[in-house]
Each structure stands twice: as C-alpha cells, then as structure tokens.
Amino acid sequence: KLYCISLVCGSIKKSFINSKEKVEGAISCNDEEEVLEKFIEEIKNLDPDIITGWNVIDFDLAYLSKKCKKLKIPFDFGREPGQCNIRIEENFFRDSKVDVSGRQVLDGLNLLKVSFIKVEDYKLDTVAKSILGEGKLIHAQGTEKYKEIDEAFKNNKKKLIEYNLK
C-alpha cells in the first residue's frame, strides 16, 4: 500500500499522504490514486532539472511505476508529454536506468559507489551517519523497518512524514 510520498525542492518540503483525516505537515489524499496524481502534478509544477534520492530508481521509481500501471495512471513527470521509461537491472554490476523527458535522475547510491568515499555499507542510515553525522528517523532494517513504517502510518503519521523528509 502506498502510504506517503515526500519531496524536497530547495526550501519547499511537501508530503502527500494517503489519509482522509487531516495530517499536520502533509497534503491529505483520499486514496493511492490521489497521492500519485498530486505528486506527479507537483513535480511538473516545480519543474526540477534533477530528481535525486537514495536508491531512487531501483526502489522509489520502480515502485511508483508499478503502482501507476496498476492504477492506470500515466507514469509521466517529464517536461514533455509521455511515459517515463524505467529499466531495472537485476545485475549488481549494471545500473538501472530511467528516462524522464527534460530531467536527469541521479541516484545517490550509484553515485556513492563510484566516488572515493569509503563507507561500512551502502544502507541509507549508515551513509547518512557517516556523511551527515546523523541517521534516518527509523533505524530498523529489513522486515523490522517495514513494521516500524507501518506502525508510524497507523499511529503516528507525523513521524512517517518526518522520516520521509529527513
């Protein structure tokens, strides 16, 4: 289930949450379709040159692409009309790719792998602690992480939003 999508663009921070109830710090949406539609509309309105994130292609965009397909929503947030094309590579030594008209998608995970920065592992929390001096709000790994995110969505949506934006 799609709970929430957040974005940061300069000083703008927005979260679109799948919740009929009003949630402080977020734009409440009635269902997954509305979350996706508002997120895509916001990307087009903000018109960024670069879209970036940690494992943004293999996780975030892959998930959003599948969800859009399932809900019959165009996976289209480029500058020109047309679907964004995503190619997920199963091979660790090849990077997945996404084509978004008029925008570059830079995956922080892939960029770090080719940099000269040495880290213990490539988990977002580890890298955030190493480079920024602090980790993510939710520190659990694997299934425990998903349980904690699920719990935040059910009982503390503000925490989920803060986790997404940090």
Where are these regions (language model features)?
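Active-site-proximal helix-loop-helix substrate-binding element of RNase H-like nuclease domains
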Residues: 15, 22-30, 47, 61, ...
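Acidic, metal-coordinating catalytic cores used for nucleic-acid/nucleotide bond scission
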Residues: 52-61
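Conserved RNase H-like, two-metal-ion catalytic cores of nucleic-acid enzymes
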Residues: 1-50
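Short, flexible loop/turn elements at secondary-structure junctions
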Residues: 9, 57, 110-112
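Structural beta-strand/beta-sheet cores of well-ordered domains, especially the beta-sheet scaffolds
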Residues: 3, 52, 102-104
